[in-house]
């Protein structure tokens, strides 16, 4: 960037800087707010995390295929991304994601992919006004119950062992032009977590591929729906042929705890 701006050669700075700081202060983490498609470049320079505004923009637009394309990046890149729905330079998430349903679906995607999840103060309450750093206070707001419930759902998923210590993979949709975003967290000795979100503006009936879940018969337990307390059993053959089938409203989501049966 400096070379392009000032038209003169520059010595690489960040690697030397980060190495020197870490030599004196081991364990220091560095996060870069970076744009212009230079996220991977700064990760390679030694930054622990880089802002992922690409995912943020694509969640706003509701283009499911572009979201999937971004999430197909290498695991090493993904785990160094900062996922967010709001930051200091943008309107608050409750304003940018204009419906609680859009907010919830986008939130579950950002929270259930690898990387660091960044949440601002009051974001989980559905607050729409920025707090004033200069006045050291925030304007009074009532917040929003649907937003609070969405963050409560996400916190339940984040507490699961598979989400904390497992491996992640995207679950591709079955069929073309699907708005469905699917992913799976797996951890040996624990149940897996599967999430499917309709990242679109119309009702979606479809399925995502079951991936490794199709290797054996499975027992699926809904994470969000208290009206369905009993687990559902699915045969491996059915999972291979039909995948995980869903019927979801715009930005609706389903999450399952999945136990593979012997």
Please describe what each predicted stretch is.
Residues 1-262:
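Active-site and adjacent substrate-binding regions of carbohydrate-active enzymes
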